[in-house]
Amino acid sequence: MSKKFTMTLLSSSLAGLLVMSGGVSAQEEKYTVPYAIGEGKWGNTYEVVKTGGNGNFRYEVKEKNGKKRSLFTFDSKGDVIINGSGITYTIHDGALNDFAQTAEKKKNGQSQSHRMTDSVVRDVYNKVYSLQRTKITGFSVEDGENGKVSLGSDAKASGEFSVAVGNGAKATEKASTSVGSWSAALGRQSVALGVGTYAYANASTAAGTAAYVDGSAIYGTAIGNYAKVDKNATEGVALGAKAISAHKNSVALGANSRTTRDNEVYIGYEEASGKAYKTRTLGGLTDGTRPSDAATVRQVDRVKDSVEQLAQDTNTRLVVEAKKSREYTDSRTTVGVNPDGKLTRAEGATKTIAVNDGLVALSGRTDRIDYAVGSVDRRVTKNTQAIQSNTRQLQEHNARLNSQQRQIRENHEEMKRAAAQSAALAGLFQPYSVGKFNATAALGGYSDKQAVAVGVGYRFNEQTAAKAGIAASDGDVSYNMGVNFEF
């Protein structure tokens, strides 16, 4: 509302001076409210009477007709407190505050101007009249520089620009938002959404029934029923029912998942307390191109084929070399020996043999060939066993990667359903008419998935509205709730 009014005294060019009502002494402190428009015209419609005592003064605005009907009262800060139909509402108006301060200065003999006119009175009265007839139990709004909004039995919004919606909901720090019965947003800029949800840390977010972010887990995010970001898990993320992020900068992805170390994304889950963690399949991956990228089954299969071919080539070469070694042992050299054991001839031999008392000496020690061949056979056997072990390991990796591909495909389908639900929720309309509920439905889609959403809303006044919606797609359900403030 515009506060730029031109006010003139009956016979003066001074703007907005306080004027006593005709026939009333200054000690009674009754003041006439001027017209907002018109030169040299002072209104006969409204008057302001100062009431109260012992330092607790208030100003009562009345009609100046025979009925003297009281319209509203305001204090020295320009605040109008309304109590009616289960509502507590505070309206702050700068012109009312200006009038109260001017009246105090005039009482002390100072000539001062003010900004309250008949149009200001009518505007404030219209707000009061409308709010007195609004029937919402447990609704409280503080309208002013540090506006706070609470809606629901025992709901409390005590921080600057805070919002608490739901029975027992609490938003205690600056810019905190708590939506849901018994929810609590106790950190600066924290958000708690859901029944029994707690966001204790600064800049934390908790969404889902009994979702929880510890007070030491700054920037923590817990989404899902009973999801939790535990003590000192700064920047931790728990996504999924009963998921727990217990380490710094770590992500627990999926129902019952729990992180095991800092800087980790963990998708395994605990089927029962105290038992070993089970695994999930991560599917839909492209082939890795960087050292930090995950490898796909396709890439591992190529490595497996290369290893198997290498093993086959190595085995062939070892068999050939072994056969060559055995052929040397089959060669013969005919020799002649005298009775004294001396060699007489050795046909085609490059080595010589001496026989003495049944002992044979072969120069060059070619008698070690058979031993060398046996050693080669043992090495070939060990290599074959190692290759078989590597083949089994590759088969196990292949099975795990196949499982990951299936999981990625399932995640992709779930993401498309979530996108369709988001599109449907975005199509729900916000209420526009003050004091009226609205019901709306919308259809959304993404790729080959569709979702339907329904929602309701209510506009409390021109500045405040709330709405909630729910969307469903192939058995999956998502929801949202929101409160809108206009300043």
UniProtKB/Swiss-Prot annotation:
Induction: In strain ECOR 9 expression is greater at 37 than 27 degrees Celsius and increases upon entry into stationary phase (at protein level). Upon expression from a plasmid in strain AB1157 (with its own leader sequence) more protein is seen at 37 than 27 degrees Celsius (at protein level). InterPro entries: Adhesin_Head_dom, Pilin-like, Serralysin-like_metalloprot_C, YadA_C. Residues 295-332 are annotated as: Right-handed coiled-coil (RHcc). Residues 279-294 are annotated as: Neck. One of its GO terms (biological process) is protein transport. The keyword Metal-binding does not apply. This is Immunoglobulin-binding protein EibE. The gene is eibE. Belongs to the autotransporter-2 (AT-2) (TC 1.B.40) family. Eib subfamily. Residues 1-26 form the signal peptide. Residues 379-422 form a coiled coil. Keywords: Cell outer membrane, Coiled coil, Membrane, Protein transport, Signal, Transmembrane, Transmembrane beta strand, Transport. It comes from Escherichia coli.
